[in-house]
Amino acid sequence: MAVSPMRASVYYVTVAGLGGEPDYEQRFTATAKDLDKVFKASSGAHVYTLTGNQATRARLTETMTAVAREAKAEDDLVLTLIGHGSFDGVEYKFNLVGPDVSAAELAAMCDKVPARRQLVVNTTSASGGSVAALERPGRGVIAATKTGTEKNATVFARYWVEALQDPTADVDKSESISAMEAFQYADRKTAGFYESQKRLATEHAVFEDTGHGEAVRAGAAQGREGALLSSLTVVRIGVSQAAMNDPAKRDLLAKKEELEQKIDALKYQKAAMDPGDYKKQLTEALLQLATVQGELEK
């Protein structure tokens, strides 16, 4: 369920790294530009996109420093890496124009951003090798490969962008697409790509959003894995997107997202709750949500 609390702003930083070959260069740049358009459609968003000769470690450092200076604790950060990565068994590096940047350096940049809720989407080859360095409480990490040894070029980024543009990715019909919904959509489409090509899959996407532990392929039905990604809205669509652009409806949208967050929390707490109390709280929240949704649609 896509249920983030109301935020003053979202900071989207997208980087298309070094392609090495013209076809990769074109693909990475096009993917980054597609994301740029999607993110700029969000009201209250701050969008930074680095491609071509701008995709350097120095420029990325400058951008993240600016975000760290401007962002507040209640804001969200979404960092997306597109391109090639490498892993030598110890250290992951994201390939950029000029010096590469390591996962540890990327984590240090993100650590300086005060936004309490962060998402890093690493769509590169060998990206699984970056998870351990990037993970921390309050930060969800998605990687296109399950380990640093899956080193072939990936297609996950293509379907991640598609997920943020396809209303069918909004599985719970909340008119917002969560990081978990986008992950599941892109993972499914990636698997379908290899099946259609009759090729052995060389990438298996994973995520980690508890702040510690191993990356996983799927969240627990009732547990911590997947809770943050499910609650973190990447983009809004439909009525929710329109409401963000309508000052008169922003308070209603805030209430809607607050109720959705409560419902999501109840789902993860169900196993530890009295069944009667769970049913009562869930019913009340669902009725309130229906009322608010009706007001938004007027």
Regions found by a protein language model. Name each.
Residues 4-298:
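Cysteine endopeptidase catalytic domains of the caspase/legumain-like
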